[in-house]
């Protein structure tokens, strides 16, 4: 079992906090930091540049204990897992890399496919000599987590996917693609828009993440999106459209949760039931009042489910459960 280090922790940090004290050494004035940056500073987060497979990635870390390796969504960064820092006080270490071309990591030398990014996460786990890892993937990060768990399960203890479909692109007979009405033509138009007007495209995308308006969280998400390299983002998006995890899911044996937002406008909430049907040791949970970012919009409920999974495996009886998140 990983050794847990004693620590003195600040107050529980939620995604909607506004008055957090930065740790020593932060150079930005408090009012200029996003709510995510404030949380990482308050929990004395470390930000380490690591070279893995010829790529240099920024890896955000805080705490000590059972490792939670958190893989961010498309156009985002590792700091988006700030609401999970509260789990440090439950004996966990949060490890949240910025994938190449996102957050504080430079663009990749190779095409950023889902498979290539999964290899980088595997190399990160190996380089840090981690064991009993709970892998957490948000959106695109879930695709990466599924592929890694199916192809490189060593060192993994559990897996959590956040509001994602195993097949994003539309396909005859497939009921769970990204946003009903999407076509091959709209996919091409989206990629073109990313390359020509990244900020404009991000503004439209960010409007679809949260179920309810929250300026502080949206500003924090926008700051992360603004750091992304548009060409990397467009290539990753194309890979996401081509990727199909349906063959991966039956190969994943670790205990797993598929957590979805009941008000997500990106994916139908019923996709969680399909994921749990395909994955032998998975349970789907729908947090009724949240959108595409359950870990940010309902951190207490999300963290409680993650804690139960990481310590005891998935709760047994029902395949899919709807929960009203407070």
Model-derived segments and spans:
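Conserved acidic catalytic loop of the alpha/beta-hydrolase fold
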Residues: 116-133
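Alpha/beta-hydrolase fold catalytic core
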Residues: 1-68, 89-93, 130-131, 283-285, ...
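Catalytic histidine-centered segment of alpha/beta-hydrolase-like enzymes
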Residues: 290-303
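Short beta-strand/loop motif that positions the catalytic acidic residue
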Residues: 252, 258-260
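Acidic catalytic loop of the alpha/beta-hydrolase fold
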Residues: 263-267
């Amino acid at each position: 079992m990983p050794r847990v280090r004693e620590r003195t922790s600040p107050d529980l940090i939620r995604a909607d906090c506004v008055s957090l004290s930065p740790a020593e050494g932060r150079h930005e004035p408090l009012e200029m930091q996003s709510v995510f940056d404030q949380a990482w500073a308050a929990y004395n987060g470390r930000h380490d540049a690591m070279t893995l497979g010829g790529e240099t990635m920024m890896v955000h870390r805080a705490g000590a204990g059972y490792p939670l390796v958190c893989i961010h969504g498309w156009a985002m960064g590792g700091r988006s897992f700030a609401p999970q820092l509260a789990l440090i006080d439950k004996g966990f270490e949060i490890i949240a890399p910025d994938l190449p071309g996102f957050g504080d990591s430079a663009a990749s030398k190779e095409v950023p496919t889902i498979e290539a990014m999964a290899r980088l996460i595997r190399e990160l786990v190996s380089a840090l000599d981690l064991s009993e890892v709970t892998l957490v993937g948000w959106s695109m990060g879930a695709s990466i987590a599924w592929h890694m768990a199916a192809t490189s399960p060593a060192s993994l203890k559990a897996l959590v996917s956040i509001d994602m479909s195993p097949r994003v692109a539309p396909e005859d007979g497939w009921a769970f693609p990204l946003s009903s009405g999407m076509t091959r033509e709209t996919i091409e138009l989206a990629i073109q828009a990313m390359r020509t007007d990244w900020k404009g495209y991000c503004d439209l995308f960010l409007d679809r993440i949260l179920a309810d308006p929250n300026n502080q969280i949206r500003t924090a998400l926008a700051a992360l999106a603004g750091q992304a390299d548009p060409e990397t983002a467009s290539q990753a998006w194309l890979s996401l459209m081509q990727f199909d995890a349906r063959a991966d899911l039956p190969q994943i044996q670790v205990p797993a949760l598929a957590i979805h937002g009941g008000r997500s406008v990106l994916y139908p909430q019923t996709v969680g039931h399909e994921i749990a049907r395909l994955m032998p040791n998975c349970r789907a949970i729908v947090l009724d009042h949240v959108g595409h970012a359950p870990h940010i919009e309902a951190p207490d409920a999300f963290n409680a489910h993650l804690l139960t999974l990481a310590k005891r495996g998935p709760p047994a009886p029902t395949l899919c459960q709807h929960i009203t998140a407070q």
